[in-house]
Amino acid sequence: MAPRSTTKEKILDVAEGLFAEYGFNDTSLRTITGKANVNLASVNYHFGDKKTLVRAVLDRYLEALMPSIQSSLIELNTRDEYNMDEVFESLRLPLRALNSVRPNGTALFMLLIGRGYTDVQGHLRWFISTRYEEVLNLFMFSISQANSELTEEQLFWRLHFTLGTCVFTMASSQALTEIAESKFDKEVDAKSVVDLLIPYLSAGMSAK
């Protein structure tokens, strides 16, 4: 069993790196197997097909992230009132904890989620929305509670604007922090970036 487990993890690790760098559409199974130094039959054995492999790569993060977000939001909703800042603040620690799933896990996860949209991976959005429906519904409910004036259409667009901002910021975090440190002669870390990001996202979601 050990060799199979090792092979499976190797495939996941290599696929993750290639998907993040080149996207889902431009990464073939042969490219993955070549870099992982395994045969195509190994991918078929462990995952069946490329779509299942894509989902498995994301689910390494999601299975750690979603229960943690759910706990944070349940705690938030024990209160009678809260604002948009506090909704986004509930995501901070769960997202940061992804760095313990994989090195630089938070940025990698956000980049992969972004790839899911830009590469039109409809099956991936379906997988996330069905497997983690309860958590996503709680998140949507929390946003609505924090800003009840939003229409369904406004919520749709603003959530996707928010996602785009997060994906760009986290995926480019190293370059952005280096530029900021050079320009302002001030040390910047990931926590500082998130501290700046949360009020910006909250203001965008609550814009009149």
Task: Specify the residue positions occupied by each region the protein language model found.
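Hydrophobic alpha-helical connector segments
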Residues: S71-A107, L159
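Amphipathic alpha-helical segments used for helix-helix packing
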Residues: S90, V101-T130, Q174-E178
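Helix-turn-helix
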Residues: K10, L18-R60
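Short alpha-helical scaffolding segments that buttress acidic/His motifs in well-ordered protein cores
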Residues: L91, L95, M110-Y117, T162, ...
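C-terminal peripheral helix-coil segments that are non-catalytic and often amphipathic
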Residues: A97, T130-K208
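An amphipathic alpha-helix adjacent to DNA-recognition modules
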Residues: K8-D13, F47-Q70, I74-N77, E81, ...
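Hydrophobic/aromatic residues within well-ordered alpha-helical segments
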Residues: K50, V57, Y61, L65, ...
